[in-house]
């Protein structure tokens, strides 16, 4: 065999093998590599998206915590205000009740004083009548009575 014929035959076989490899072997390998690269890129994109979602979720958590703290502060302030208002209302009610009790006691004391005065007047009147009766029984003197009446008349004028 001739060296040139062998070389040409090897070249033909090489080109057929290269063509066969390029036509049937290389495309599935390239396709598999492209799919693998795409999966890796998708995985990296998903990881980036997950990072972004995690950062967004963390921001939302921080915001919700801030809102919850603010809301708790508002609730606490409202409760303190309501408690203060209830205390003020209770004090006002107690003051009103005390004032009513004081007024009732003063009215009762005034009524008792009035009753005592009337009872005292009645007693003084009874004593005066009794004293006058005793005086009149004891001494009936027309001249003394006339003098008394004259003195009374002068005092009244």
Swiss-Prot record:
InterPro entries recorded: ATP_synth_B-like_membr_sf, ATP_synth_b/b'su_bac/chlpt, ATP_synth_F0_bsu_bac, ATP_synthase_B_chain
Signal peptide: none
Pfam families assigned: ATP-synt_B
Gene3D superfamilies: 6.10.250.1580
Parts of the chain that traverse the membrane: 7-27
GO molecular function, one term: proton-transporting ATPase activity, rotational mechanism
Entry's Gene Ontology cellular component terms: plasma membrane; proton-transporting ATP synthase complex
Main location: membrane
Location within or outside the cell: Cell inner membrane
Function: F(1)F(0) ATP synthase produces ATP from ADP in the presence of a proton or sodium gradient. F-type ATPases consist of two structural domains, F(1) containing the extramembraneous catalytic core and F(0) containing the membrane proton channel, linked together by a central stalk and a peripheral stalk. During catalysis, ATP synthesis in the catalytic domain of F(1) is coupled via a rotary mechanism of the central stalk subunits to proton translocation. Component of the F(0) channel, it forms part of the peripheral stalk, linking F(1) to F(0).
Family: Belongs to the ATPase B chain family.
Assembly and interaction partners: F-type ATPases have 2 components, F(1) - the catalytic core - and F(0) - the membrane proton channel. F(1) has five subunits: alpha(3), beta(3), gamma(1), delta(1), epsilon(1). F(0) has three main subunits: a(1), b(2) and c(10-14). The alpha and beta chains form an alternating ring which encloses part of the gamma chain. F(1) is attached to F(0) by a central stalk formed by the gamma and epsilon chains, while a peripheral stalk is formed by the delta and b chains.
Name of the protein in question: ATP synthase subunit b
Species this chain originates from: Azoarcus sp. (strain BH72)
